[in-house]
Amino acid sequence: MAVPKRRTSKTRKNKRRTHIKLAVPGMTECPNCGEYKLSHRVCKNCGLYNGEEVVSK
């Protein structure tokens, strides 16, 4: 059975794992208040979605 000849270093291990990561969510600016919000979702700050008040604050 094959075994590693040398121990894999931390640097080599981390370089191999550079592509294993989470994607950053798409953030957009709210046209009403200017706060950043997730796309296609209600703004947490002002409660508007697509120009209509969905959540009253």
UniProtKB/Swiss-Prot annotation:
Which InterPro entries does the record associate with it?
Ribosomal_bL32, Ribosomal_bL32_bact, Ribosomal_zn-bd
One Gene Ontology CC term in the entry? large ribosomal subunit
Protein's GO biological process: translation
UniProt keywords (A-Z) are: Ribonucleoprotein, Ribosomal protein
Among Pfam families, the record links this protein to: Ribosomal_L32p
The molecular function GO annotations come to: structural constituent of ribosome
Q: Which family does it belong to?
A: Belongs to the bacterial ribosomal protein bL32 family.
What the entry lists under PANTHER family is as follows:
50S RIBOSOMAL PROTEIN L32 (PTHR35534), LARGE RIBOSOMAL SUBUNIT PROTEIN BL32 (PTHR35534:SF2)
Q: From the Swiss-Prot or TrEMBL record, give the protein name.
A: Large ribosomal subunit protein bL32
Species for this entry? Staphylococcus carnosus (strain TM300)
